[in-house]
Regions:
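Active-site beta-strand/loop architecture of penicillin-binding DD-peptidases
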Residues: 126-128, 146
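Short, small/polar residue-rich loop motifs at catalytic or cofactor-binding pockets
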Residues: 134-136
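Short, structured beta-strand/loop micro-motifs enriched in basic residues and often containing a Trp
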Residues: 131
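Short Gly/Pro-enriched loop/turn and capping motifs at secondary-structure junctions
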Residues: 115-118, 138, 157-159
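Short, well-ordered beta-strand elements
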Residues: 140-142, 147-156
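Short, surface-exposed loop or secondary-structure junction motifs
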Residues: 1-124
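Residue-level detector of beta-strand structural context in well-folded domains
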Residues: 108, 128, 138-140
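Generic C-terminus detector
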Residues: 157-181
């Protein structure tokens, strides 16, 4: 896990799959990942920090454990709580930038679920979960109510939200609305 990867790490990067004419076409990692390997005046979203699946899962476990990982305190409990608390002004009603994700706000670095799924089309999940997804259809989430974390890494462009909906339905069940009492 590092910001701006050394060239020697390029062979370890997953290839990118691009949806073209209804088929997935594999793109070479060197062509798909150039912004991870050079200095940029401004790094666009989706580039810069790169990690392994294992490290990302450790990060998620640390968050679900309120800042502790393998017995070591990494972040204060209050920091994790602040990160996972909606920081948006309630006056901001337009949330079209989060299609299919339901009633969510935004914490520091995460979307935060504010109410149970209201429609069958919404992603399954629990109130208080926090998550983020990436341009290449990646997803991670932390569900404190169920003590659950998930890291779902595919490298598919353009973004495909149906993968997330189907993955969450497989984890929670298609009719899940949250733990009892939500």
């Amino acid at each position: 896990t590092a910001w701006r990867q050394p060239d020697a790490k390029l062979p370890r990067f997953a290839a990118m799959n691009v949806q073209t004419d209804g088929k997935l076409v594999q793109q070479d990692a060197a062509a798909a990942q150039p912004l991870h390997f050079r200095d940029n005046a401004l790094t666009p979203g989706g580039f810069g920090l790169a990690s392994t699946l294992d490290d990302y899962q450790r990060f998620a476990r640390m968050l679900v454990n309120k800042g502790t990982l393998d017995g070591a305190r990494i972040l204060k409990r209050s920091t994790v709580k602040l990160m996972a608390t909606d920081q948006l002004d309630p006056a901001i009603k337009e949330r079209a930038w989060l299609p299919g994700k339901g009633a969510v706000g935004f914490g520091f670095d995460f979307a935060v679920r504010k109410s149970p799924p209201q429609t069958h089309e919404e992603n399954r999940g629990a109130v208080g979960e926090f998550f983020w997804d990436g341009a290449a259809s990646t997803l991670f989430w932390v569900d404190p109510a169920n003590k659950l974390t998930a890291v779902f890494f595919v490298q598919t462009m353009p973004y495909d939200g149906t993968l997330h909906r189907d993955f969450r339905a497989a984890v929670y069940g298609p009719d899940y609305k949250g733990p009892p009492g939500d």
